Amino acid sequence: MADLPPLREVIARHGLDARKSLGQHFLFDLNLTGRIARAAGDLTVGSVIEIGPGPGGLTRALLDAGARQVIAIERDDRAIAIQNEIAEAYPGRLEIMAADAMTVDAAELGEVPRRIVANLPYNISTALLLGWLRRADAFERLVLMFQKEVVDRLAAPPRSEHYGRLSVITQWRCEVRPLFNVDRRAFTPPPAVTSTVVDLIPRAEPLAPARFETLERVTAAAFGQRRKMLRSSLKSLGGAEDLLERTGILPTARAEEIPVEGFCALARALDARTLDGHQSA
């Protein structure tokens, strides 16, 4: 464990006040950062990618847990200066990328097994996740902190209040394991809601065959009007009744009733119909 000053002292010295525009909420509790790092498993091989490390509490915990290589992606110059100090204390183990995480292909960083471990900026958390799910096979696991309501959606089963597009796409590519809640008072500044750490384990194969882009289209249409019957909500895809007949799904069913495999069947039917149309043209 490196001899580094307390986080609050580091923040004061660098003037690192949390910026709402960057979705920053800093975590100072070393017990919590250590717990998150341990949840990621054996870090002594491969690479760990951290998004928005801020003052570096989780960065330190990952390195103290034995991480062979941490790649920290940060766009805030003040935080980058702090990360450089941490890198000096852990020679050769911390790489800092001065970049916007939304523009970085994390699936191409570091070495396998590749993990993402992060207290995500809340304002871009779901957008980041959807990007990583497109390349889910590039990661061994993702241990992430979101607002609790987001994790409720990730883990929600069909016919439940929180089941939606994000549930379908995430569960299609990953096993979803909510780990523990983090009280809002653990952060500076405290967010408005409770947070939850979740462990996402990419599946060796998706839950059912489908193309990512098509599954996105189908779920966006279905859950865009979630209270309507599918024969109405899928009209924007054209030929809703035909799609439902091809998949054996009742036209009177609603999106929240359909399991992940059912949405995959709809995506395959949509692609098959598109292919049939091209071949007959």
UniProtKB/Swiss-Prot annotation:
PROSITE patterns referenced in this protein's UniProt entry, alphabetically: RRNA_A_DIMETH, SAM_RNA_A_N6_MT
Disulfide bonds: none
Signal peptide range in chain numbering: none
UniProtKB keywords: Cytoplasm, Methyltransferase, RNA-binding, rRNA processing, S-adenosyl-L-methionine, Transferase
UniProt enzyme class: transferase
Any Gene Ontology CC annotation: cytosol
Catalysed transformations (reactions): adenosine(1518)/adenosine(1519) in 16S rRNA + 4 S-adenosyl-L-methionine = N(6)-dimethyladenosine(1518)/N(6)-dimethyladenosine(1519) in 16S rRNA + 4 S-adenosyl-L-homocysteine + 4 H(+)
Positions annotated to bind S-adenosyl-L-methionine: H25, L27, G52, E74, D100, N119
Job of this protein: Specifically dimethylates two adjacent adenosines (A1518 and A1519) in the loop of a conserved hairpin near the 3'-end of 16S rRNA in the 30S particle. May play a critical role in biogenesis of 30S subunits.
Protein name, per record: Ribosomal RNA small subunit methyltransferase A
